[in-house]
């Protein structure tokens, strides 16, 4: 009787255990931590060129001048925990120095920025085990569109948000408190949508929208928790500041970028494993239904 009850208690957990095993096997086989390390290295190499290109695009549109300042503050406050102000100061100095570059140097910056997008594309297709390759021209067009249209769309959305917030009917206390609550979860929503687009669009194979949404939600939640946990770790255990002093910002930034890519790739692995788990269950059911006939 006791064993029967134990079986009834464990049976709902069996799918979760099976899925967990499949996920762990896939993560181990793909070498998730090594892929995250590769992307972290490329990210640090491409960070300044990417930011330079993005804010150069904002500078080309005078209507985005004020929005670019708000966007900088929003990114560094919500996506880089702790030491965000120090990193922001350094990056702004690097961007200011890059404005004196020649045409050849500017082209080099753009190529380096595109290198990050190419690396993300390659790693995600490794995880999806996709053998379909896009043409070089098509890939370049997609990368360039992401690099140019992405910041412009973000800027346009912030312009619209600023306009809506300036309307008089939104000054009501109840509406104002509701807006505060929405703004509080806004970084989570942005992360969720960004990860969903990443998992849906980048792979060269078809990705079920539901799987991409679930994987993106897990990644977004882990990203928010990781951001708070990382900030707490840096505050409570300031070992990097004690050892490296002024240079502590370098290992801290690398550690955060590496951790962020681990989360992004984990969301991708979850998305892929959901499809594989569903296919395996469907196969098992078909075998069971066919066995009496045999």
Swiss-Prot record:
Membrane topology reported for the UniProt record: Multi-pass membrane protein
Record's keyword annotation contains Cell inner membrane: yes
Keywords from the named record: Cell inner membrane, Cell membrane, Membrane, Transmembrane, Transmembrane helix
Places the protein is found: Cell inner membrane
Keyword check for Transmembrane helix: yes
GO annotations of cellular component type: plasma membrane
Main localization (coarse): membrane
TM helices/strands, residue ranges: 44-64, 67-87, 108-128, 136-156, 185-205, 212-232, 246-266
InterPro entries named among the record's database cross-references: UPF0761_bac, Virul_fac_BrkB
Lineage top rank: taxon: Bacteria
NCBIfam families for this protein: PRK01637.1, yihY_not_rbn
Family (UniProt): Belongs to the UPF0761 family.
Protein name per Swiss-Prot or TrEMBL: UPF0761 membrane protein YPTS_0028
């Amino acid at each position: 009787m006791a064993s029967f009850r134990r079986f009834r208690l464990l049976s709902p957990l069996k799918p979760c255990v099976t899925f967990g095993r499949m996920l762990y096997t896939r993560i181990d086989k793909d070498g998730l931590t090594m892929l995250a390390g590769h992307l972290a290295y490329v990210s640090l190499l491409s960070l300044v060129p990417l930011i330079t290109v993005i804010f150069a695009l904002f500078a080309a549109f005078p209507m985005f001048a004020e929005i670019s300042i708000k966007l900088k503050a929003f990114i560094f406050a919500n996506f880089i925990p702790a030491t965000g102000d120090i990193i922001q100061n350094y990056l702004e100095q690097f961007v200011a120095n890059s404005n004196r570059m020649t045409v050849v140097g500017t082209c080099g910056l753009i190529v380096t920025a595109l290198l990050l997008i190419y690396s993300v594309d390659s790693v995600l297709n490794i995880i999806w085990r996709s053998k379909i390759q896009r043409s070089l021209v098509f890939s370049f067009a997609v990368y360039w569109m992401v690099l140019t249209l992405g910041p412009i769309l973000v800027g346009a959305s912030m312009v619209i948000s600023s306009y809506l917030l300036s309307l008089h009917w939104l000054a009501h206390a109840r509406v104002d408190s509701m807006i505060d609550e929405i703004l509080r979860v806004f970084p989570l929503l942005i992360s969720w949508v960004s990860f969903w687009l990443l998992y849906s669009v980048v792979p060269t194979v078809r990705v079920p929208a539901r799987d991409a949404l679930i994987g993106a939600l897990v990644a977004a939640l882990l990203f928010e928790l990781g951001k708070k946990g990382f900030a707490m770790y840096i505050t409570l255990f300031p070992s990097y500041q004690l050892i490296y002093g002024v240079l502590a910002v370098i290992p801290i930034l690398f550690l955060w970028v590496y951790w962020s890519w681990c989360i992004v790739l984990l969301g991708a692995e979850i998305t892929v494993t959901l499809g594989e788990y569903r296919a395996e269950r469907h196969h098992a059911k078909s075998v069971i239904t066919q066995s009496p006939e045999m």
